[in-house]
Amino acid sequence: MSTMTPAEIVSELDKHIIGQDKAKKAVAVALRNRWRRQQVAEPLRQEITPKNILMIGPTGVGKTEIARRLAKLADAPFIKIEATKFTEVGYVGRDVDSIVRDLIEISVKQTRETEMRKVRSKATDLAEDRILDVLLPQPRAVGFGASVEHANDDNNATRQTFRKRLREGQLDDKEIELDIEQPTVGMDIMAPPGMEEMTEQIRSMFSNLGSGKKQRRKVKIKEALKLLTDEEAAKMLNDEEVKTKAVQNVEQNGIVFLDEIDKITSRNHEGGGGEVSRQGVQRDLLPLVEGTTINTKYGMVKTDHILFIASGAFHLAKPSDLIPELQGRFPIRVELDSLSVKDFEAILVATDASLVKQYQALLATEDVALEFADDGIRRLAEIAYAVNEKTENIGARRLYTVIEKLLEEVSFAAGNHAGQSVTIDAAYVDRALGEVSKDEDLSRYVL
């Protein structure tokens, strides 16, 4: 679990997302409250439930990006799903219980990786020993006494020399033959609605049939070291302990990001008599959000302390169009602002992995130095903003389209400009995009 303070979380989010301070603060406080709750003594700890968040804002302003970055910071099981993927129980489609099943799978993988990192050093030593056994087989005892001891001493000295060379990477390209455990290949079985548990049991039964088989393979030492390290680390893990920790991690620290929640409101589907009931999906989500117990292949999982963050553009619907019970389960409401020209400028240059830095790095691979003048950045931002206003407002995603069109010729002919510098100023932007951005019909299709 992350032990970062709210200020530190916001500072990290600022490196990747421009503006939206209210949303960042709400998410940072919610994440910090997970840690605070763990410091509270029982039985009060059980009574403290997370305050779920509803993020409201147009598309392309950072709702999903905040969730994505939060996942990396949280160091906790995290899943992002679209609410539109789910249907009411009884209809063809996924039911909402699969959210928790997917989350526990993520947690098991995360916990396994954490536990494997703890034993990796020891596993690497054992993997090196197995490789050295192939390169330098143990000498057979032919003589007696001193001669055998002398042979063993020589072999140990040689092994140490080879181990040093192995660690320095001098033997990486040498090929050896090894018996390597085969990874189990899962079977894909289509699950009928409501029978996911039975399908999961059948799948695990079939996957266990092939486990433990070894195959003799010829591999390079670099790859062999990785395969054997993973194999040795897996042997050291206690699977039951991993499952228990994973379930506990989901129950105490799990985060579910429900995207497009506005698309399952009744306002969005008025008059659709033959449609799957969206209100039914809301009613199915309700017990999950307020706390229930879901049966998974790793055991029973309680959802009482899982944090739910929902988001939606709410163009056609309002948060009040959600069923009242579900509205009450998202007490923290945060509105995200539409992006201004200044925001677009900052998105282009101010973030850690800004679009400008990405394109500069891509063209640098072909020895083309791409320079952006301040007036060029300003003009790009103005065009992106203007096209959003005139056509459909897709937020920051418009910048991808605009900059891709702008650099189309440079990217295509990069090989001919090796060793040269290309400066993008306002005049260059106007030449490349001026006509397209002014013509509304053209910009609808091109930008």
UniProtKB/Swiss-Prot annotation:
Pfam families listed in its UniProt record: AAA, AAA_2
Subcellular location(s) per record: Cytoplasm
Residues binding ATP, per UniProt: I18, G60, V61, G62, K63, T64, E65, D259, E325, R397
InterPro entries: AAA+_ATPase (IPR003593), ATP-dep_Clp_protease_ClpX (IPR050052), ATPase_AAA_core (IPR003959), Clp_ATPase_C (IPR019489), HslU (IPR004491), P-loop_NTPase (IPR027417)
Main subcellular location of this protein, as a coarse class: cytoplasm
Keyword Mitochondrion belongs to the record: no
Single GO MF annotation: proteasome-activating activity
Protein name, UniProt field: ATP-dependent protease ATPase subunit HslU
Protein species of origin: Burkholderia thailandensis (strain ATCC 700388 / DSM 13276 / CCUG 48851 / CIP 106301 / E264)
Lineage: Bacteria, Pseudomonadati, Pseudomonadota, Betaproteobacteria, Burkholderiales
